Amino acid sequence: MAKIQLVAQANLPTEYGIFKMVGFEFLDTKKEHVALVMGDISNADEPVLARIHSECLTGDALHSLKCDCGFQLATALKQIQEEGRGVLIYHREEGRGIGLINKIRAYSLQDKGMDTIEANLALGFKADERNFEVCADMFELLGVKKVRLMTNNPEKVETMKKAGINVVERVPLNVGENRYNTKYLDTKAKKMGHYIVHNNDEQHLMTCPHCQEEII
């Protein structure tokens, strides 16, 4: 088990209901992660609706349309609210682990024509620098053994299984596609094996506020 510990918790009222915010910290690096917990998750035999959400300042806080992160965060919290119980782990690995400034550098390369993977490689990073094992450690500290994991990323599922977390179901999270992120989603599907279902059909183009200006 990684050297991470549960260090603080408090109630957090949100537009999706009241969550318990749980803070975790690595003993050596002092790096922090957070989990949002709703309802009673103490029954280890009952699968918990869960989401591992990697930090994305641009999508989560600044409402960027270049990715689907902000849409996934909102949808996951709403689904937990509807379920009445669940866990969202906020995984502090900005920019797939390369950090915010390098993410901006990667965006600059994408403006010049590279895709999201090519940009990371050009900067000297792997396609994905994240380590999801710490998320399994956080689940364990929360007493969660079985999850219904909201994700399109097969690596998250496999990492949880290898770490001893029983993923009984993968819940798709295909939301937020628009004309600014279709290439990004396509790249994740083709080069990273993500389970992406495109929504760029005629009905989507007619109803999506981010696509309408393209067809007027």
From Swiss-Prot:
Q: Which domain of life is it from?
A: Bacteria
**An individual GO BP term:** riboflavin biosynthetic process
The residues that hold Zn(2+) are 56, 67, 69
Which molecular-function annotation in GO is an example for this chain? Answer: GTP cyclohydrolase II activity
Q: In which pathway does it act?
A: Cofactor biosynthesis; riboflavin biosynthesis; 5-amino-6-(D-ribitylamino)uracil from GTP: step 1/4
Q: Which HAMAP family match?
A: RibA (MF_00179)
Q: Which family does it belong to?
A: Belongs to the GTP cyclohydrolase II family.
Q: What does this protein do?
A: Catalyzes the conversion of GTP to 2,5-diamino-6-ribosylamino-4(3H)-pyrimidinone 5'-phosphate (DARP), formate and pyrophosphate.
Indicate what this protein is called per its UniProt record: GTP cyclohydrolase-2
Q: What is the protein's species of origin?
A: Haemophilus influenzae (strain PittEE)
**Gene behind this protein:** ribA
